[in-house]
Design a protein with these regions (language model features):
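Cell-envelope/extracellular polymer assembly enzymes that use nucleotide-activated donors
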Residues: 3-5, 172
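Donor nucleotide-sugar binding loop of glycosyltransferases
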Residues: 13-16, 61, 87
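A conserved acidic beta->alpha catalytic loop
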Residues: 35-44, 84
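Acceptor/aglycone-binding surface of glycosyltransferases and processive sugar-polymer synthases
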Residues: 57-59, 63-71, 76-79, 89-167, ...
Length: 223
């Protein structure tokens, strides 16, 4: 996987990120880009690791992903969490799927052999509803639309012209992939418990924004 860059947004992840980077030492990726929102504690915690730390310019999870992709140079990029919930053992399988004529590969907690140790009833039900909406409104062939463990061809990521600066990015990515008729597939994965820190998602506020974005993309075809 010498042509793969991992994009890791990191906000208040000093407890978990060093453990994540230590685990990633066992995997042969070309580069790891940490998008740091001026968090001195997190930056200090990873100063002995080989990675590129980029200071985030705009606020939000989506902005961190977009800025990370813009800094990448490799053929492939993968969105990866700083909290330890994404298991890197799936990277190789996703990479092989990309090399089998796919432009994007989504990890899914809800395919057979997938699962989650971090889901709550609220996030489970919400994800099922949003995934169903994706199928109905956009004919998306996905089982886990809110899980952003996504690997893709960098040139095709750039063609999406992503704009969302928050968690609405998890809807924008698959909707634009579908509209542009890019090839994508999914693999089962198990979401682990986070290694430290706190969740950044506000289930109610972010859920409302995601719902709004569904209907916005449905009504505005060229956005």
């Amino acid at each position: 996987m010498k042509d793969l860059t991992l994009i890791i947004p990191a906000k208040n992840e000093a407890e978990s990120l060093p453990k994540v980077l230590k685990e990633l030492n066992s995997f042969s990726v070309k580069k790891i880009i940490i998008i740091d929102k001026h968090d001195k504690e997190t930056s200090r915690s990873i100063q002995n690791f080989y990675c590129l730390v980029v200071k985030q310019k705009k606020n939000g999870y989506g902005s961190a992903i977009i800025e990370g992709i813009q800094r990448a140079k490799t053929k492939y990029v993968c969105i990866f969490n700083a909290d330890g919930s994404f298991d890197p053992k799936y990277l190789k399988k996703m990479y092989l799927k990309l090399n089998n004529n796919n432009h994007f590969v989504f990890a899914s907690r809800y395919l057979k052999d997938g699962g989650s140790h971090d889901d709550t009833l609220l996030t489970f039900v919400g994800n099922k509803i949003f995934t169903l909406l994706g199928k109905i409104l956009f004919k998306l062939n996905l089982s886990d639309i809110l899980f952003t463990y996504i690997m893709g061809n960098r040139n095709y990521f750039n063609k999406l012209k992503l704009k969302s600066n928050d968690f609405r990015l998890c809807v924008e990515i698959p909707v634009k992939i579908q509209r542009k008729k890019f090839k994508y597939t999914s693999i089962p994965s198990i979401e682990r418990l986070r290694l430290g820190g706190k969740k950044k998602v506000n289930e109610f506020l972010d859920g409302f924004l995601i719902l709004y974005s569904f209907f916005r993309y449905y009504l505005i075809k060229n956005d």
